């Protein structure tokens, strides 16, 4: 069994693979304040820090505590979540992963984390909300402590005029109880040898918010092994940019608006914020009279653009990546399935003077570089019994695993550099350059899996 804590003499204890949830009521947060946590046992916390022991379960009256650890079984909101521990077998439940909760309201937050261990090397990946990657592979040497910071968005489904967005319920899963829409900011501490020394959370009032509207290929997928590029994109930005990924599986431009998701974005948008728009997979299935890439699709894109500009925001179009289309390759690349929608988006970009990130074109280069057989490594293609409860093979040519999502996020980051130069200034210096015709090797991308596994729950859309 992995211990929750790494041994050491440093006054603040190191947490192993910890998922931290910030829940929304108990600390009386009518006005946001700074929260500082020091995880220790048998020692006094630093001045101004809250001491929490690993044996302390979440207590709503206190507003913080563990929802799950090696000594605290799953309780309360974690059990009721749609990623709840049904997939956590007894063998996986002793990994040292734990969940910690503390109250915060909706908004953007700057998160500062001190990494390190007095006697051992550490390697930590940070995820937020539904597996949103914030920091990748932060490494320290024995006795070394480093501080990394990022800005994260926390949202609620409530609309200002009353009511909520149109939350979905599918296969027994309630979107309203997902980590994207509940009362929590979720931070998952993962990696080969995680080491977190302390944590500070501060409301961020001046951050740029990068909103995303899209479908299952973009969204923060709550369950392994499914991934969207929008859940990887935050890891490429420096503190001061919060990615608010409102994309949802199964949606098209018209249904995203019908479910009041665009309205929610516009309510939260401030001048200078961005909305990245990627649809096409599900718009293609619209059989209503007059529907099509050069009619309703273009009209809906223009409607979004107008609404964003009225709020002082900056719209950016992203053409839909191609499906792998594994049974239909010609001349070494997949036959196109979304070419008309990509062309229509490019036309709208030119007509409306809106930046267009051509992910469709870049994705074809990416798949072609891997080859027909090799490209399965970017998608959810796995033999039976790869994941808990998965008794049948998975062969999905639409939805991506973490490697595929990571490579597409790199494509989007490259598109930002060429098409959205002001936002590109906020990319991390080590983002580097990326050519999809020369992608990273699949084995070189190591994003540790979360415990929230749902291999038998395919996202809506195709």
Regions found by a protein language model. Name each.
Residues 1-12:
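N-terminal secretory signal peptides that target proteins for export/translocation
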Residues 29-223, 390:
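Compositionally biased, intrinsically disordered or flexible polar/acidic segments
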Residues 260-429, 437, 448, 457-462:
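Alpha-helical cap/lid subdomain in secreted, periplasmic
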Residues 90, 251-256, 333-334:
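Short, flexible loop segments at the rims of nucleotide/cofactor-binding pockets, characterized by
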Residues 180-182, 190-196, 202-212, 217-307, ...:
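Conserved SGNH/GDSL esterase-like catalytic core that processes O-acyl groups on lipids
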Residues 36, 243-245, 353-356:
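Conserved beta-strand scaffold positions in the cores of enzyme catalytic domains, especially
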Residues 13-26:
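Bacterial N-terminal signal peptides
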